[in-house]
């Protein structure tokens, strides 16, 4: 055999070997990927209540140690009521957009939600009778911007360990953010342009740390992201308080990037899911830049537009479903996609 032929054969063997090694590596990656899929034995369909259906969608173990659940709720209605801050006072508040329970008004109470049957704009219908509301958002010319396909998250969050999260108590209500004149920080009220590149450390790419607490100047064709985060540490006693805030607290922060290394303060020792409202708006020639938009609650012209971002929440979940969300998705560290309940079922879709 000539030296040239021998070299060609060696080269061919090396190529084959590299192909085999690449195939094995790819197979290993696939095997590891599939190993992250949660093995589920779904319940019998006859056992499912209305609003809950079987689903063969895969659920994966979260890659960052958090446990997550998400759900969609459509806009329901608009009014100037606020049953938490102005109970039984029709029209006493600034304009709000409501989601979930379709009859939320100044007279809505926890009993109202718990006795409701089929009035909800959320996935699962009557299984999620929670009342969600936020101030209306307007362009510079006064056109209201619709909250399209918003996502409502129930997560362990990055600060607390997933396995210590408790089911929120029935009857719990709370407010995130401030509608008053004092400026707020980005713990609760978060805005950012989707085109921004976060320059600071973060827990993961889904939690950039370049948010601002006011409406930013996003260019045309960009996307404005808005996120309102509720406190997740409960005092363990009171379902409400005089200001709808004092019975709740934000956790003591984890050390970046170590997820779950924070804790609840001693005054508010009970950890519940981190609830957040998540919205996105396209920036167009018609809407103009978000820096020119304003909230219905923006009353102080000395502060940047959007500084009054806040949200209200009243727990109207079916207790069994909320327990499934916490036990199946959050405590386990699973990443349950929109509507998935972590047991081979999901909430009935609305889109």
Features from the language model and the residues they span:
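Hydrophobic alpha-helical membrane-insertion segments, chiefly the h-region
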Residues: 18-30
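Primary mode marks residue(s) on the alpha4-beta5-alpha5 output face of response regulator receiver
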Residues: 33-93, 97-228, 235-351
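A generic signature of intrinsically disordered, low-complexity regions enriched in glycine/proline
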Residues: 11-13, 26, 98
């Amino acid at each position: 055999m000539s030296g040239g032929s021998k070299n060609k054969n060696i080269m061919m063997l090396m190529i084959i070997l590299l192909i085999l090694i690449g195939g094995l590596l790819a197979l290993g990656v696939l095997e590891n990927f599939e190993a992250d899929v949660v093995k589920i034995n779904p319940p019998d369909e006859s056992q499912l209540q209305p609003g809950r259906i079987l689903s063969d969608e895969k659920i994966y173990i979260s890659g960052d140690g958090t446990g997550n659940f998400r759900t969609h709720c459509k806009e329901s209605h608009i009014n100037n009521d606020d049953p938490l801050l102005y109970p039984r006072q029709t029209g006493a508040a600034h304009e709000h957009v409501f989601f979930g329970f379709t009859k939320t008004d100044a007279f809505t109470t926890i009993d109202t939600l718990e006795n409701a049957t089929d009035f909800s704009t959320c996935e699962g219908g009557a299984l999620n009778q929670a009342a969600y509301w936020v101030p209306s958002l307007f362009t510079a010319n006064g056109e209201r911007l619709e909250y399209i396909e918003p996502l409502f998250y129930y997560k362990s969050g990055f600060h607390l360990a997933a396995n210590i999260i408790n089911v929120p108590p029935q009857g719990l209500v709370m407010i995130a953010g401030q509608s008053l004149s004092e400026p707020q920080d980005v713990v609760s009220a978060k805005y950012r342009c989707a085109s921004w590149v976060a320059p600071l450390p973060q827990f993961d790419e889904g939690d950039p740390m370049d948010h601002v607490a006011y409406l930013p100047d996003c260019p045309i064709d960009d996307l404005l992201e808005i996120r309102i985060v509720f406190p997740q540490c409960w005092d363990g006693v009171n379902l409400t308080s005089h200001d709808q805030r004092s019975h709740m607290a934000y956790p003591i922060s984890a050390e970046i990037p170590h997820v779950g290394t924070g804790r609840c303060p001693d005054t508010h020792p009970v950890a519940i899911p981190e609830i957040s409202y998540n919205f996105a708006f396209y920036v167009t020639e018609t809407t103009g830049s978000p820096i020119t938009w304003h909230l219905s609650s923006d009353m102080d012209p000395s502060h940047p537009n959007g500084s009054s971002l806040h949200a209200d929440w009243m727990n109207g979940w079916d207790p069994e479903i909320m327990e499934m969300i916490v036990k199946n998705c959050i405590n386990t560290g699973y990443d349950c996609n929109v509507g998935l309940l972590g047991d081979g079922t999901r909430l009935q879709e609305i889109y």
